[in-house]
Amino acid sequence: MPAIAVLAAAAAAWCFLQVDSRHLDALAGGAALNNANFLDNDQWLSTVSQYDRDKYWNRFRDGIQDDYFRNWNPNKPFDQALDPSKDPCLKVKCSPHKVCVTQDYQTALCVSRKHLLPRQKKGNVAHKHWLGPSNLVKCKPCPVAQSAMVCGSDGHTYTSKCKLEFHACSTGKSLNSLCDGPCPCLPEPEPLKPKAEKSACTDKELRNLASRLKDWFGALHEDANRVIKPTSSDPAQGRFDTSILPICKDSLGWMFNKLDMNYDLLLDHSEINAIYLDKYEPCIKPLFNSCDSFKDGKLSNNEWCYCFQKPAGLPCQNEMNRIQKLSKGKSLLGAFIPRCNEEGYYKATQCHGSTGQCWCVDKYGNELAGSRKQGTVSCEEEQETSGDFGSGGSVVLLDDLEDERELGPKDKEGKLRVRTRAVREDDEDEDDDKEDEVGYIW
């Protein structure tokens, strides 16, 4: 028995020496190999926290994806292998639900763990699979050259558009560039929309102005007929008389002829400017612009005269239209029916058929005080204007060649000249109006 015990002890000692010698040989061989690449040194690898138990360097700083570089050959020379000190993930801190993935020494991405497949076990060996490597192989790497930053549709700033496309490719997201430069994108300035020119005057104001101008022209025409007698030497004789047109009766056609200084039956800006007093009537220019149907900057005689035939500006005609709408084609018993002239204004004499009373009115239908009587009354057919153009009075056209004196029957007519005669007030004595006052009526 003692001999057997001695033999067993000797055999155990010999086995220990064999194992120990093999271990030393392995360490010696490993040290020699590590002279070529120190990454194969198990002792060095154990001190690096980012390497897993399989001792393969993982540049994603996460043990879950350490199989990304399973195909990396650690026996390559160091200049062709990976430099751990240049791992870009060392400077990146991802959120708890993401891990760091690098493409090269300058590109690091935080990838969601949802893109990682769960571990599958075969026996007692853990096999880890991840779709990232296959995706990254398909994605086009970005050049090292610097480029302009862009803001992605995910709200993150990328150093280049290529980096944005690479991130979209590697993560499977649909991303696009919102703007150049860092996020957030500044709102783009709205394109200047052409502002529609707003008319300075409403339609009602234009109609009222046309009505006042028509009254003014009527007063000018009336005064011209009183003080001016055409002579055989008048250069205006022999040309077309616009006043004979159906829509240019009396004062409208007469005023057109006076303004048409070159006798071309068109009023240009220089001719219309004779009545442009923008300081007092800012709606004059918009009125004539609205009457220029052909938009050629000129007014024909038809355009001129139609400009003053606004239905809404004819008081008596408007009243007749209102009565017709109320009656709906039936006769209104006991209703007052006004009498209108051809221009759409009230006639001077108005009578009520049911009561037999008559009275005098102006062209706008305003009854003259004390004129109402039973039976017929005598009213002047041409009433004074309403004074809408101001308190200065009505306007008389005079000859430029004449002196500033009272006109006689032998005076001549030439270019336009403007003077005023005072309007007699109802409450003033006739002795107070002896001399005319020169000036604009505005």
Curated annotation (Swiss-Prot):
> Where does the source fall among the domains of life?
Eukaryota
Which cysteines pair up through disulfides? They are 89-100, 94-110, 139-169, 142-162, 151-183, 316-340, 351-358, 360-379
Q: Name one GO biological process term.
A: central nervous system neuron differentiation
Q: What is its main location?
A: secreted
Where is each Thyroglobulin type-1 domain found?
313-379
UniProt PTM comment:
Contains chondroitin sulfate and heparan sulfate O-linked oligosaccharides.
Q: Where is the Kazal-like domain?
A: 133-185
Glycosylated positions are: 386, 391
Q: Which InterPro entries match?
A: EF-hand-dom_pair (IPR011992), Kazal_dom (IPR002350), Kazal_dom_sf (IPR036058), SPARC/Testican_Ca-bd-dom (IPR019577), Thyroglobulin_1 (IPR000716), Thyroglobulin_1_sf (IPR036857)
Q: Which UniProt keywords apply?
A: Disulfide bond, Extracellular matrix, Glycoprotein, Heparan sulfate, Proteoglycan, Secreted, Signal
State a single Pfam family of this protein. SPARC_Ca_bdg
* PROSITE patterns membership: KAZAL_2, THYROGLOBULIN_1_1, THYROGLOBULIN_1_2
One annotated Gene Ontology cellular component of this protein? sarcoplasm
Q: Sorted alphabetically, which CDD domains does this protein's record hold?
A: KAZAL_FS, TY
Role description: May play a role in cell-cell and cell-matrix interactions. May contribute to various neuronal mechanisms in the central nervous system.
Q: What is the name of the protein in this document?
A: Testican-1
Q: Which organism does this record belong to?
A: Mus musculus (Mouse)
Q: What is the lineage of its organism?
A: Eukaryota, Metazoa, Chordata, Craniata, Vertebrata
Q: Which gene encodes it?
A: Spock1
